Amino acid sequence: MEPFFNLSKQVFFSKIETLNAILLDVRNADEFQEGHLENAILIPFENPDFISLMSDFDTSANYLVYCRSGNRGVKACLMMRSMGFIGEIFHLDKGYEGLK
C-alpha cells in the first residue's frame, strides 16, 4: 500500500469533486483564517494533540490533505498511515501556496 499519493492541483481538485473523501487542512489557525478550501477541516499538524485529534476520524475513509507548501502535509500523511489509516490518502503537491 502506498503511504499516500502526491497530486497536482488539477488532479487534487478533480478528486474533491468525484471522491467521497474528507478534506483536511493541516496548516495553523492563522493560515486557515487567511484562506482555505471550501469544506476543509482544520487539524493543525503542529498541534501537540494532532494524533489525539486524528484518532476521532474514520481510519477507513479517504482523505485529501494539504498544508501551505507541502512539507507539513507530507508529514501528516505519513503520520496518518502510521496511525493505521487504511483508506486512500491524497496530498496536494506544493500545498495551498501552489494554487496561486
For each feature predicted by the language model, list its residue ranges.
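Rhodanese-like catalytic fold shared by cysteine-dependent sulfurtransferases
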Residues: 1-21, 29-62, 68-100
